[in-house]
Amino acid sequence: MSQLPVLSGKEIVRLLKSIGFTEVSCKGSHVKLKGFRAGEKRIVLVPLHGELAFGTLRSILRQAGLTVKELGDLLK
């Protein structure tokens, strides 16, 4: 999967929780999640707006330590 799918913030939060991230706080329209990937502590901020822009989605993936391919595998 080389292209990013169109996802909402709520869908990303659900995916991150499924791989072990936990919700730390929710302030306004953003959720802060904490988790561990590859032995590193990761903090991810996810906006809960409608569909996420591709740049925002890429930034969230980078913060979470995920690749586009791993995201595709999680969506299957």
Predicted region positions:
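N-terminal first-folded block
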Residues: M1-K27, R37
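Glycine-rich, flexible loop/turn motifs
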Residues: Q3, R42, L71
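C-terminal structural segments of small proteins and small subunits
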Residues: E51-K76
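A short, structured beta-strand/loop element
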Residues: E23-G55, S59
